[in-house]
Amino acid sequence: MLNKETFLGEAFKRLPKELINKIKNKKIGIAGAGGLGSNIAVALVRSGIQNLIIADFDKVEYSNLNRQYYFYKHVGQYKVDALEEQLKNINPYINIEKHNIYLDENNFDIFRNCDIIAEAFDKAENKEKIVNYAVKNKKYIVSGVGMAGDYSANIIQTRKLGKYLYISGDLKNEATDENGLLASRVAITANHQANMILRILQNKYEV
């Protein structure tokens, strides 16, 4: 295996040099490791992020394989463990702090030392709670809302709602029994979130 310096030089040589210098010591919190969280984490690691805190209580199920960044072999594993494996297959030198816990207002403080939080929950009430935590603590948070169905990808956007809150998605199409989730729209939303995180880290606050 290549040593760290050589590997990072090769792996990141196509990235903007300004980006690499600004993000190399930054830490991102990933709240949820499902369809949004797993894809956000992959995009960030491929973009040069080297420090992550990832939290989720769930295990990989067969029904996750249609949109989450896991493979057949991961079914039955805790998502935080499976995602760590996936990310270290991209960059073996990244630093990952993982928490196999159900996130709520009693433990959001695991993200207190993060520069930005990526919100990747399923339920609206949980999204609201962590957004309130982040804004109260003057911490940037990028949330995902509205990515279900096979609607046009062009209605997925990122919006700035206040100094610390950004929301990616179409803001209306949530998953139901009739309105399922496609890998394409979930990944587009997740990559909107990842891209906004990278912009904020470079002090580019406009969407």
What are these model-derived regions, one by one?
Residues 36:
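Hydrophobic/small residue at the entry helix of a nucleotide-binding pocket
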Residues 30-33, 54:
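Hydrophobic Val/Ile/Leu positions in short beta-strands of Rossmann-like dinucleotide-binding domains
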Residues 40-41, 83:
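Hydrophobic residues within alpha-helices
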Residues 80-86, 90-114, 121-124:
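A structured beta-alpha segment of the ubiquitous adenosine-cofactor-binding alpha/beta core
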